[in-house]
């Protein structure tokens, strides 16, 4: 009985260690940088330029026509992207003219994007949310999206417009700042044809 109990405890400890190792591996996924259009490395000034760039870390991907980085250490750094910038995550995406992406502890932590306008989209099981603004600040760790400047957000049959909207992707909560807000409730789709009248008895 004691031996059997000891084996169960040992198995539980091994399973817990394996789960912890798996979580650690996810946090330490490698970041791959590909420059299809070439590079320009100025080592004397620590400026690195990439053309036709794609950065991938697991299911997170960034593509742009150009990128500039002050150093290649992406454990804790900031990169500037410009030209047809697209940032895709497992359940969301951003598109913009320019972007500043921050790397923290070896992973992408946030993205500040600007455009005319910049756009955002989140996919959920049976619906989606999308928005646009002059600037969008996306915090991957907190799961928040700040739409700043002519902000518009569509979610769950509602359209919200305002100067600044803060959207939480985890609980679908919207907070407005810096001025009035207009909310438009969209009706359900009308039937394409009128129902047939019931036959008279």
Model-assigned labels for residue ranges:
Residues 1-201:
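Mature-chain termini and adjacent capping regions
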């Amino acid at each position: 009985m004691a031996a059997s109990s000891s084996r169960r405890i040992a198995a539980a400890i091994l399973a817990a260690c394996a789960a912890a190792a798996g979580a650690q591996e996810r946090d330490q996924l490698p970041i791959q940088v590909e420059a299809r259009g070439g590079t320009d490395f100025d080592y004397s000034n620590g400026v690195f330029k990439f053309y036709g760039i794609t950065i991938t870390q697991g299911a997170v991907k960034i593509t742009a026509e150009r990128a500039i980085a002050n150093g290649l250490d992406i454990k804790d750094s900031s990169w500037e992207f410009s030209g047809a910038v697209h940032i895709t995550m497992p359940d969301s995406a951003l598109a913009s003219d320019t972007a500043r992406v921050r790397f923290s502890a070896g992973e992408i932590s946030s993205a500040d994007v600007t455009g005319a306008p910049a756009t955002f989209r989140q996919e959920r099981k049976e619906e989606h949310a999308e928005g646009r603004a002059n600037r969008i600040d996306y915090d991957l760790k907190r799961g928040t999206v700040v739409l700043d400047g002519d902000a518009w957000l569509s979610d769950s049959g509602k359209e919200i417009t305002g100067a600044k909207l803060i959207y939480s992707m985890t609980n679908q909560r919207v907070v407005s700042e810096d001025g009035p807000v207009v909310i438009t409730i969209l009706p359900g789709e009308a039937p394409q044809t009128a129902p047939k009248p019931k036959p008279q008895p």
